[in-house]
Amino acid sequence: VVQAGETVNDGTLTNHDNQIVFGTANGMTISTGLELGPDSEENTGGQWIQNGGIAGNTTVTTNGRQVVLEGGTASDTVIRDGGGQSLNGLAVNTTLNNRGEQWVHEGGVATGTIINRDGYQSVKSGGLATGTIINTGAEGGPDSDNSYTGQKVQGTAESTTINKNGRQIILFSGLARDTLIYAGGDQSVHGRALNTTLNGGYQYVHRDGLALNTVINEGGWQVVKAGGAAGNTTINQNGELRVHAGGEATAVTQNTGGALVTSTAATVIGTNRLGNFTVENGKADGVVLESGGRLDVLESHSAQNTLVDDGGTLAVSAGGKATSVTITSGGALIADSGATVEGTNASGKFSIDGTSGQASGLLLENGGSFTVNAGGQAGNTTVGHRGTLTLAAGGSLSGRTQLSKGASMVLNGDVVSTGDIVNAGEIRFDNQTTPNAALSRAVAKSNSPVTFHKLTTTNLTGQGGTINMRVRLDGSNASDQLVINGGQATGKTWLAFTNVGNSNLGVATTGQGIRVVDAQNGATTEEGAFALSRPLQAGAFNYTLNRDSDEDWYLRSENAYRAEVPLYTSMLTQAMDYDRILAGSRSHQTGV
């Protein structure tokens, strides 16, 4: 027992020893008191700081426990390797290392605690933690389940700093205020979080959780999940607010460059640079999408007066409707021919009629995509960098279809274009039953089910673009096909073939070869209109691309053996010669 007015320096507690401190104890090392489990009242032993008692520079290690009772004070304690500190009094500047734990009970106050890797602070109902620095708890990734590292709050946590890999979990009865979260740190809100600042950090508001007055700065994001609520959130440049279906965010301030990611199944109300906006009851009005922002308009839901600016995306599901849409340079639209969308883009007016499946004037870029379903049609479509136009069997094109460098057009069936295709990007024949090919070797998985398709167009202008086609070189001599119907093929188009047959079984072609470009109804093809983008080989054969007098283009083996074949055929002879040399040498050595 350290009596009031008495000071004890240094010492070690082990094997259920007790130290009762009414005076002052400095530099103690405690290795007992937790033998029966963490924070259990059945434990005996350890250091007990009584009312008026003071402990400084204590080290609490494996199985050690320091108990700070009401009116007691502990300062500069280091807790590590499974040791623990139980507070009903005051603890100042505690450091938790490697499974060190601090339990702040009702009436207890922890100030300036630092929680390092695998440390854990539990702030129980009626407890208070202020100025905590959290460096652990999120090593498993954002919002992952690390239950017993970091900080868990059932009471109150104030002025907390959460650094990279740090996590604060606010339970149903918990309250956290004035929290600062840096990149790589996160806060999981099941109770209440007030005045949180996200400087690259993350805040997750779960069902029944409430976050008020959150400020989202660059690199930070607030995620409001189903049943969660946020109020007075401010989104600054390059910050992001995500509101899931069934989540609610009200009084939102979206500043220029801030991103909103949500759907018409959520509730989001606030202001942006255009004025007031709303997303509620399946309707959106006045939403601004930029810097990674996205609005999903779901089936039977609608949106109006949407601005899709640089880095923003508007996605409209089949049966959804979006009117008065403005898409600026850098914005993206995702839809199919079952959606209804109308507005303006950088090329002018555009529209999609979900009833007829007709689309006109689309500009697809920056991750934007449009799918033409069976019976639908896309007219005068421009596909820019990172844009994708997909056509199902029975979908069609009209007018001018322009593919820029970095653009893609995917064909999942036979497709007809009654106009012109200008290709500086990639056209790819595909179907959902065909696995992705190993294009670097121009070989797909053998014996895969394949349905070959045709792309028919009046005119094709190649601007250095590529058409990826599938072919079988193991006997069936079948392939996808480009048909020029009554027009012409000009410029330069690269043909890239993927062998979807047995790559080890190449067969010599017969007749003119495998027709891959078919000029019909008086169509013409320039002599240099097509070329192979890479060597095409199967079995012992190389295959070449040839233009005939009928303007069609064919793949032919022409008995052009691969360079390896002469080597293979000479190996047996070389082996026999080598055997003779060895035999002669052996005879000479033995004198036989």
Give the positions of each predicted feature.
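Generic structural motif
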Residues: 33, 52, 82, 107, ...
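Intrinsically disordered, low-complexity Ser/Thr- and acidic-rich flexible linkers and loops
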Residues: 35-42, 139-150, 437-444
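Extracellular beta-solenoid/beta-roll
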Residues: 10, 131, 196, 269-272, ...
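Outer membrane beta-barrel translocator domains of Type V secretion systems
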Residues: 558-592
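Acidic, glycine/serine/threonine-rich low-complexity segments
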Residues: 139, 147, 273-275, 279, ...
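Short, solvent-exposed coil/turn segments at beta-strand boundaries
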Residues: 15, 34, 63, 82-83, ...
